[in-house]
Amino acid sequence: MNLDLRTVSAIYINLKKDVKKDFEMKRLMVDFGFKNVIRVEGNVIPDRHLAGCSLSHYNALHEIDPPFIIFEDDCVIKNNTPEIEIPDDADAVYLGVSSWGRMNAHSGPFVQYEKVDENLVRVYNMLGAHAILYLNQEYASMCSRIAQNGYDIADHQDIGFAEIQRYFNVYALNDPLFYQTSSNGTNEPLTSYPTQELMQPHRSFWKPTALY
């Protein structure tokens, strides 16, 4: 189906202290042409930075009903192409990509994907959460539960996001509309990055089968 992203509510997460990023995100929203923009204040939790990040995503996921886009405030426009074609069965579409994926309890260059066409891939374990289009409540609710757990254990919520992609219809634009200034491997087409499979997890992640 054809979707004009400018008609979708755009939510961006921004810390109160990051005034410059707030200004830059407001400018991004205008430049892209979003009609409904919502700022969600990010959470700072002393000594639990990752918990604050996960809580911020949790709050953003509860702001309105899907469809909506959640942005982190270090996004930059790469391709100003508001109208996109997406599959009718899509639960979510990553408008930004990452060259890193999650496999066998490791994060690295392990993104597994299936090419749909030149512009779209289905992803199964891709990390990153800087620009995601959420299309239905079931998927958004699952991501909300993951973000809640990320807050509870003070860990990256995007690890959980990556690990459930295989159970949903999650796609990514091969050539991203947005990239992340704080991360490498987010500004080129996903298929241009080398990828591999991690088949032998590090022993430190193994659990004993028996205790003696």
Report the location of each language-model feature:
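An acidic/histidine-cluster motif and surrounding catalytic segment
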Residues: M1-F71, C75-Y212
